[in-house]
C-alpha cells in the first residue's frame, strides 16, 4: 500500500513494487524563465548576471560588493583575446577593498599561515609535555 507522509518541509512518499511497475502519468511543466521565484543559475536567460545566485557566496553583497560586481561584470562581458585582461583596474580595486576587511575576506595564504601556526603550537606543546614526562621519570 503506497502512502504519503509530511515531515516538516519534507514530503515522504512510500510506494509499492506495483507502483513502480506502472508507467507514470505525471505531466512535466516547463520552467517559466520569467518566474522571479524560480531558482536561476549564475547567468540569467537574458544573459545578465544573477547577483542573487548562491554560487557567488554572498560576494555581491557586503562592504566590497560593488567592487566585486564591477570586476566580475568586466570579466564576464570582456571581449579581449585574453578574457579579463582589460579588467585589471577593477580587480585591483576589489582586492584593495578586501584587504581592508581581512576578517570577512581571508586570503588563502592567511588561512594556511594560521593553520601552520596552530600546528607548530600543538607540536611545541606536545614536545614540551613529552620532555617534562621524561624528566619526571628519570628522577
Curated annotation (Swiss-Prot):
Give start-end positions of Basic and acidic residues composition bias. Answer: 115-124
Q: What GO molecular functions are on record for this protein?
A: protein-disulfide reductase activity
Q: Where is this region: Disordered?
A: 102-139
Superkingdom, natural source:
Eukaryota
* Any single Gene Ontology cellular-component annotation: mitochondrial intermembrane space
Q: Which PROSITE patterns match?
A: CHCH (PS51808)
Record-linked Pfam families: CHCH (PF06747)
- Keyword Repeat, does the record have it? no
Motif (Cx9C motif 2) positions are 87-97
Residues of the CHCH domain? 61-105
InterPro entries in UniProt: CHCH, CHCHD4
Keywords attached to this entry: Disulfide bond, Mitochondrion, Oxidoreductase, Protein transport, Redox-active center, Translocation, Transport
Which cysteines form disulfides? 53-55, 64-97, 74-87
Decide whether keyword Oxidoreductase is in the record.
yes
* GO BP annotation list: mitochondrial disulfide relay system; protein import into mitochondrial intermembrane space
Q: Please indicate the residue ranges that the annotation assigns to the motif Cx9C motif 1.
A: 64-74
Complexes and interactors: Monomer. Can form homooligomers.
Q: What does this protein do?
A: Central component of a redox-sensitive mitochondrial intermembrane space import machinery which is required for the biogenesis of respiratory chain complexes. Functions as chaperone and catalyzes the formation of disulfide bonds in substrate proteins, such as COX17 or MICU1. Required for the import and folding of small cysteine-containing proteins (small Tim) in the mitochondrial intermembrane space (IMS). Precursor proteins to be imported into the IMS are translocated in their reduced form into the mitochondria.
User: What does the entry note on its domains?
Assistant: The CHCH domain contains a conserved twin Cys-X(9)-Cys motif which is required for import and stability of MIA40 in mitochondria.
Q: What is this protein called?
A: Mitochondrial intermembrane space import and assembly protein 40-B
Please name the taxonomic classification of the source. Eukaryota, Metazoa, Chordata, Craniata, Vertebrata
Gene, per the UniProt record:
chchd4-b
